[in-house]
Amino acid sequence: LTSVPEETGSPEEQAPPLPRLQLRDPLPPVIDTVDDYVAYCARLALGHGPVALDAERASGYRYSQRAYLVQVRRDGSGTGLVDPIAFDDLVDLDEAIGDAEWILHAATQDLPCLAEVGLHPTALFDTELAGRLLNLPRVGLASLSWSTTSG
């Protein structure tokens, strides 16, 4: 018989510490007035580089896949939390983005509801698809974020 070494400490003690998450900027208010929307679109147009987007749907509470919040981030323009329900469409936001590359996670989930409000990418980078192409074992946003920042 061989002996199995006894484990010391609980799994929590053996796991590496989780990174401390901090917002880069203060949490912005939700954009739900025309004046705030126009001002954010102007800032977004002056930004540079790709644009990160995310749509929040209320599919657990509603029968539609409509976007109820659109989150936007671009270097030089900050974060925008746009309430698409407050506006007829988000065509001005689409024009402010122009031909900048979009960065989404699980793009197939968000593209239909973003198109419904007038947002259409000309170039797209999907972080979930990138994780699959890299043959990563987990491609959820949290797992990808952890694997790319903990290294």
Stretches found by the model and what they are:
Residues 18-30, 68-151:
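Active-site-proximal helix-loop-helix substrate-binding element of RNase H-like nuclease domains
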Residues 1-51, 55:
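N-terminal accessory regions of nucleic-acid-interacting proteins
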Residues 48-53, 57-64, 81, 87-88:
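An N-terminal domain-cap segment
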Residues 40-46, 59-64, 71-72:
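Short secondary-structure boundary/capping segments within folded domains
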